[in-house]
């Protein structure tokens, strides 16, 4: 059987923790930041965990990271 390829686009966007959680960056921190509050910008810094319904899709794109 041939090797499975990792989707490089997914590898750049997701990080797998030691416990197996898949984290992603939150949207909304690129531009138009002056109208957003400090608290909101701080909350956007915290990585989010992907939803359970999307987990299998990401796992297929990252075969060797889980």
Curated annotation (Swiss-Prot):
PANTHER family: 54S RIBOSOMAL PROTEIN BL35M (PTHR33343), LARGE RIBOSOMAL SUBUNIT PROTEIN BL35M (PTHR33343:SF1)
Name of the protein: Large ribosomal subunit protein bL35
Parts of the chain that traverse the membrane: none
Assigned keywords, A-Z: Ribonucleoprotein, Ribosomal protein
Stored Pfam families: Ribosomal_L35p
Disordered: annotated segments: 24-44
SUPFAM superfamilies the UniProt entry points to: L35p-like
Family the entry assigns: Belongs to the bacterial ribosomal protein bL35 family.
Name of the gene this protein is made from: rpmI
GO annotations of cellular component type: cytosolic large ribosomal subunit
Cited Gene3D superfamilies: 4.10.410.60
Keyword Ribosomal protein in record: yes
Organism: Dictyoglomus thermophilum (strain ATCC 35947 / DSM 3960 / H-6-12)
């Amino acid at each position: 059987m041939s090797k499975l390829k990792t989707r490089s686009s997914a590898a750049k966007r997701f990080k797998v923790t030691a416990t197996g959680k898949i984290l992603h960056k939150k949207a909304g921190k690129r531009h138009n930041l002056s109208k957003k509050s400090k608290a909101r910008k701080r909350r956007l810094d915290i990585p989010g965990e992907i939803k359970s319904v999307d987990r299998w899709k990401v796992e297929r794109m990252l075969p060797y990271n889980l």
